[in-house]
Amino acid sequence: MAAPRGKGSRSSNSRGTRGARGKRQRGGRPAFETSRVEKNNDDGSSGSDAEAESPPIDELSSDSDDDYDADGEEKKMDKPYNTLLQLFNTSQDTNGPARKRRKVDHNSKKTEIQVEEQDELHDEADLSEPEITDDDEIEDLADVAAEEVEAGDSGDENDNSSSLSLNIKAISSKGWLSHKSELPGRFRLMFSHPDTGGDTVQLPAPIHGLQSLKLKQKLALHAGDHITKFDSLASGLAPSIFGYHDLLFGARTLSNSARFRDLYCLHVLNHILKTRDRVLKNNSRSQKVPDQDLELRDQGFTRPKVLIILPTRQACVRVMESITKLYHAEQQENKTKFYDTFSAADDKSWENKPDDFRELFGGNDDDMFRLGLKFTRKTIKYFSHFYNSDMILASPLGLRMVMDKEDSKKQDFDFLSSIEVAIIDQADALLMQNWEHVEYVFSHLNLQPKESHGCDFSRVRNWYLDGQAKYVRQTLVFSSFITPEINALFSSQMQNTAGKLKITPTYAGAILDLPLPVPVKQTFSRFDSTSPVNDPENRFKYFTNAVLSPLVRSSTGGRGNPSASGTLIFIPSYLDFVRVRNYLATSSQTENLSFGAISEYTSVRDVARARTHFFSGRHSALLYTERTHHFRRYQIRGVKRVIMYGVPENPVFWAEIVGFLGLDPAGAAEAAEGGVRALFSKWDALKMERIVGTKSRMPRRNTFWSHQPPSFLLLE
């Protein structure tokens, strides 16, 4: 598996498909001593000279940047009659190239159409095909008229314009009313809605099945086969999801991930079908009374209505599996091409890896991808042009690579101007990639387009024209835990006038569930920090003065002293890792301390050498980053004590890192005595809640817990 991409890097590494993961070294930079071994070692056993740069991003033949250039978008026709005339005239033109014909087996109920890859790249006939044709998109208009279109789902906003203005005014002034409550299953709910001075907004009542939802008939026929009885959590959240509330769900687990994935896929499919049917119905109305000046505002600037942001290609495959089982299409164009380029087999050597690791990195773990989907009455088309697509599935890096160009004239993000439902799944995994890409994408949602792209402005909704689309957009975020970065997204980008929900679990505490045969002392050292900006500096000063000095004194006894080796220093931030590593390598205070360093950029060879030296005692200490553990899940042997420069974001990592103390049964008693010491400040409140538990008050002084039975003691 390739090394992960570093924070702040835009194009440093793509976790690509297996067999194509190369390395490139950082050129033109002097080597830096990243480790120190005992002086009696030979030259060949020294630490790593320089950290390896992550490999370059592979170019994607299936969805290159050119595939999504704005200049090749399809042009919408004002009238279906004109569209048919254009098609007829094109077919009569013998001078131009003949239109491509696709052979379809009409005897089969489901047909997969394979389109050659070059046809996806600037095929003028394909790009200029009309959006609506009698053959594939016009459904029974009587059925369309019979179905009610909900107010939040592409309805006529004219009657609610005054209410919308009041809500937007309240949101702009940060006027939110929040209500907190407890949910069954140890969950906490916070519901916020705009404070307009009117009556309190109530959440919709829980439902117990799909029969309570207004689904399109095409979806209702098959959804019940895959989404059966709701549990208490799903029954409470489903009405809010289908009611177009914003949702931040901070309790995603392996057991509930598939259920919520099916639920939001059903929701976005229902939204796309209802939106399309309203357009078809209004098209019919305008044809029946062509002389009347009808106010039919039912569209956005561009066609894409749904954006789903995912961490890996394999996660995209899982979403497509949910979509295809809910939306039964007779034809699936480029399905084989999709699975060939997006899916892969799991690595058999990962049998001992944790379940959450295998879910995230199993299969194709490439994090640079994008996919357009177009839905018609009979067909799902993979790899459709963005401006022809109803739905876009992509990673943050994949989107940014097509949006952010060095040449400002080539920058293109107009396809995000009319997104009505935005979804982030596995947001905690995106934090370990590069969260800045997520912020960049959301900062470009629902902006006024630079070009018209064939838009019929007489049909564009008023809130798009007024630049208010972000207040009507629904945003759903699913994460295993909530961090300050995710909270910032919740506060700044989730501005839905319908209101927003935040779901968080009640944590028992990771300190109570350790995989150790004996109790272990766990000490939490709090340091003063005046602000989040000054926190790194305050943490470093506390570490060098209060923690590092005793460590250096214990290491002066040399290799013969058992207490002189086996210290693992866990560092969550890569920037803090670089600072501590440089200090250990250059400071006179640590000139007698032998150490190794493993980060997410360390080469495989240097990782193996550092682990060997640490286990043998030639390295007294080993620096180890959280992102390294996230991407690798190493089992570090030889650990006798753990110093946590900061507590991990992921509470699962606490048990895994502390569990290193028990990997050597012979030294378990000594390791338990060495124990764990973790540094924290008041700005680590969210992380500390997951570690010590929701009901435990965050300690104000040095504190330790023993493993079994759980006890609590304050050290004066």
UniProtKB/Swiss-Prot annotation:
UniProt-annotated stretches for the region Disordered: 1-112
Low complexity composition-biased segments: 1-17
Gene field: UTP25
Keyword Ribonucleoprotein: yes
Keywords associated with the record: Nucleus, Ribonucleoprotein, Ribosome biogenesis, rRNA processing
Name assigned to this protein: U3 small nucleolar RNA-associated protein 25
Organism name: Ajellomyces capsulatus (strain G186AR / H82 / ATCC MYA-2454 / RMSCC 2432) (Darling's disease fungus)
Domain of life: Eukaryota
Taxonomic lineage from the root: Eukaryota, Fungi, Dikarya, Ascomycota, Pezizomycotina
Biased segments, Acidic residues type: 60-72
Family under the similarity heading: Belongs to the UTP25 family.
A Pfam match: Utp25_C
BP term (GO), one: maturation of SSU-rRNA from tricistronic rRNA transcript (SSU-rRNA, 5.8S rRNA, LSU-rRNA)
InterPro entries assigned to the protein according to its UniProt record, in alphabetical order: P-loop_NTPase, UTP25, UTP25_C, UTP25_NTPase-like
Oligomer status and interactors: Component of the ribosomal small subunit (SSU) processome composed of at least 40 protein subunits and snoRNA U3.
Basic residues compositional bias, start-end: 18-27
Subcellular location(s) of the protein: Nucleus, Nucleolus
Function description: DEAD-box RNA helicase-like protein required for pre-18S rRNA processing, specifically at sites A0, A1, and A2.
GO molecular function: rRNA binding; U3 snoRNA binding
GO CC terms: nucleolus; small-subunit processome
Biased composition (Polar residues): 83-95
UniProt-listed Gene3D superfamilies: P-loop containing nucleotide triphosphate hydrolases (3.40.50.300)
